[in-house]
Amino acid sequence: MEENWILKKLDLRSENLGTCLAAGEWIETAGPMIESYNPTTGELIAKVQAADKKAYDWAVQSAQDAFKSWRMVPAPKRGEVVRDLGNMLREYKEPLGDLISLEMGKIQVEGWGEIQEMIDICDFAVGLSRQLYGLTMTSERPQHRMYEQWHPLGPIGIITSFNFPAAVFGWNATVAAVCGDTMIWKPSELIPLVAVAIQKLINRVMADHKLSGVFNLTVGAGEIGQQMSHDKRLPLISFTGSTPTGRKVAGAVAERLGRSIMELGGNNAIIVTESADIDMAVRAILFSAVGTAGQRCTSTRRLIAHESIIDNLIDRLTAAYKTVPLGNPLDPSTLVGPLVTERAVIKMQAAINQAQKEGGTLLVGGQPRPDIGPLFVEPAIIHMPNQSPIVREETFAPILYVMSYSELDEAIDIHNDVTQGLSSAIFTDSFRMAERFLSHSGSDCGIANVNIGTSGAEIGGAFGGEKDTGGGRESGSDAWKGYMRRQTNTLNWSDELPLAQGIEFG
């Protein structure tokens, strides 16, 4: 059976420990067993024991102890450790990707792609380990030198969501590691097996380098996340999840004057102009809207089409939606797998009903498919007369709301008139329209694309958004600065003691 092969290949059992610290030490706790279910079939895959308060404290202590020595390892040497982690992930890319499909429900190529994304960020972090640059400034005082340098921040907390159980951890963990930080990881309690499998591979790499305590794991529910948020021993919390939960986490961290990186909701839109390549737009919208069953932070949820082409675009999209195969995500012919929980199915149905009450017309999909599995729902397209309240909400499901516009200013106003600000895109062959969309008066999102969809961000750019999306940045570019502390230094190599601003004292 394929499921058994996946578990055996990744050294997973029917019951697994969920707390790992120090030298790859897995510890038993008084925490409950978390049951992981296959969303495709509803059947139990395996169990993972949750951390309790005592185990959590041990994990933090492990990270604190390791930080004292890890921060002193030269950054390029830290990069060598991350390079070996990337190579380990290459070796286990397919079984890890299959486990994501099994436990979370995204299709196989997306599961493999997620592990590739973690491999890519390892490669990026290796290069970054030799590029943690500071600046040199000119002092106004003679024979003085000023510069800034970046120091490791400390043990940090990483709280990840169910939809990208490997990649988002990789964005944070690999960059933090080369920056000299140690960490505690709390994965989503919905997808604990992926975290346990990754931690076991990390342990092998750390053992090869005779290191311990840099990466620590505490599987658990919200209680563990609450402890992390309030814990002054963790100067930074990186949180990926819903906006309501993110507000609570950010508030708790801010109350203790800690740092937070928030990657929260996205109500992402694509504008399709009258000059757009419709063939290209249809392909991009389809992938962005139904990929991962609409459970990406960057999934396209709103389509804003010019009035002259909207009918043609709707006809093309509805025809494409009718051909999308739903099924077992480990079947290569499947394009859409299940939603992750029954609660997600209920929320999707409620949103469709509410959209219809607000004047929307259900054009295609939206029907539960219990004949395939308990959590399958057909991706839906709903034509809306305007951007009503339900459209302004983020429903984490494959629902695409379609609206029309006449002038680009109107389209941009509709686009920006939501509380979220993660990803956005425009399809156009007009240079002026593209530049307008990317300008100060265009998209207000952290990510803005031209002639590609809202999903599929590369690791080289900083990932994150504005407004209720949280303002945090992860992954590439200079996001690494969030994991370090900046220090400004002044050196006096003269025989005098001049003061700044020409002040004379005494």
Q: For the regions a protein language model found, what residue spans apply to each?
A:
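Conserved C-terminal structural/oligomerization subdomain of aldehyde/semialdehyde dehydrogenase
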Residues: E43-A46, L211, L234, I271, ...
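ALDH superfamily catalytic-core signature
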Residues: L201-R204, P244-N386, L408, D413, ...
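Hydrophobic face of amphipathic alpha-helices that form TPR/SEL1-like repeat modules
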Residues: M1-T41
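Residue-level signal for inorganic ion chemistry
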Residues: G42, R78, I100, C122, ...
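Rossmann-like NAD(P) dinucleotide-binding subdomain of oxidoreductase/dehydrogenase enzymes
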Residues: G134-M280, Y405
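Glycine-rich loop-to-alpha-helix module at the N-terminal edge of alpha/beta enzyme cores
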Residues: I45-L132, Q143
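Short, well-ordered beta-strand elements within core beta-sheets of diverse protein domains
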Residues: I45-A51, D65-M72, I158, I270-T273, ...
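Residues at or immediately preceding the N-termini of alpha-helices
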Residues: P39, K53-Y56, A75, K93, ...
